Amino acid sequence: MIVSPHREGGQAQFIAQPVPKNTRDARINCLLDYLQQHIAEPHSLDSLARVVAMSRRTLTRHFARATGMSITDWLTAERLRRSQTLLEAGDLPVEQVAEAVGYLSAVTWRQQFKARFGVSPTEWRRTFRRGA
């Protein structure tokens, strides 16, 4: 059984849907490992298909079946999850956090972060620093 951590004082849990990291498809698992190791790099469907020796169409189908999401959605979710960790544990300026997780635009990253978690990256960092 998986239980979400509890925070005292009515603080929001900030727990979003987990990003799948392991599937029953060995080639997709290899791709997920590759993407996690190269999260900051730009990726195209063609380049990812080459990594796992699949056609674009086959990769798209296998990835969606294995993870329940598109490659783009998975990458976005993983980049946002990784940025949470950097904000909580590090002192990188916000713009550098965006770059470290593969965003070319800090503005786009901020918008996606706030849409996903309901707070700005700066507010996220402040919340977790206060609790430390």
What is each of the regions a protein language model found here?
Residues 120:
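Nucleic acid-binding interface residues in structured DNA/RNA-binding domains
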Residues 42-47, 54, 64-106, 126-132:
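Terminal helix-turn-helix DNA-binding modules in bacterial transcription factors
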Residues 2-3, 114, 129:
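Short amphipathic alpha-helical surface patches that mediate protein-protein
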Residues 1-41, 47-52, 65-70, 77:
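Short, Lys/Arg-enriched, Trp-marked, Pro/Gly-tolerant hinge/linker segments that flank
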Residues 59, 63, 108-109, 113:
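Short hydrophobic/aromatic patch on the recognition helix
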